[in-house]
């Protein structure tokens, strides 16, 4: 339960399995980026009923601090990602939510 004085602006955390090979790039300004697809599946209780929650979400990791952690990310890695979500426009012009990682933890 959130307290009324608690300010949460844009925070998102999800645990899942990497389902697409990470793609690493470097921007013209020299910032390193790593992008991959994370798949999440879980059972959630909603209005007293169990429902399956499922999503595939693109994750983007930027900057030297987290990039080193991405070297061991492979398809099938189970990870927890904490960050913020924003909208990116795809090549086909559609808007897609992307999770920008601020923390990554490997789950055994």
Swiss-Prot record:
Involved in the restart of stalled replication forks, which reloads the replicative helicase on sites other than the origin of replication; the PriA-PriB pathway is the major replication restart pathway. During primosome assembly it facilitates complex formation between PriA and DnaT on DNA; stabilizes PriA on DNA. Stimulates the DNA unwinding activity of PriA helicase. Keywords: DNA replication, DNA-binding, Primosome. Belongs to the PriB family. Signal peptide: none annotated. PROSITE patterns: SSB (PS50935). This is Replication restart protein PriB. Homodimer. Interacts with PriA and DnaT. Component of the replication restart primosome. Primosome assembly occurs via a 'hand-off' mechanism. PriA binds to replication forks, subsequently PriB then DnaT bind; DnaT then displaces ssDNA to generate the helicase loading substrate. One of its GO terms (biological process) is DNA replication, synthesis of primer. GO terms for molecular function: single-stranded DNA binding. Residues 8-108 form the SSB domain. The keyword Mitochondrion does not apply. One of its GO terms (cellular component) is primosome complex. The keyword DNA-binding applies. It comes from Haemophilus influenzae (strain ATCC 51907 / DSM 11121 / KW20 / Rd). InterPro entries: NA-bd_OB-fold, Primosome_PriB/ssb, Prisomal_replication_PriB. Pfam families: SSB_1 (PF22657).
């Amino acid at each position: 339960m959130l307290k009324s004085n608690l300010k949460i602006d844009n925070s998102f955390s999800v645990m899942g399995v990497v389902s697409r090979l990470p793609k690493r790039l470097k921007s013209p300004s020299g910032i390193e980026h790593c992008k991959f697809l994370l798949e999440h599946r879980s059972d959630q209780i909603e209005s007293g009923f169990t429902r399956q929650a499922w999503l595939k979400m693109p994750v983007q990791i930027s900057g030297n601090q987290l990039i080193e952690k991405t070297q061991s990310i492979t398809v099938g890695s189970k990870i927890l990602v904490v960050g913020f979500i924003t909208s990116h426009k795809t090549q086909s012009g559609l808007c897609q939510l992307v999770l920008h990682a601020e923390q990554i933890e490997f789950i055994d």
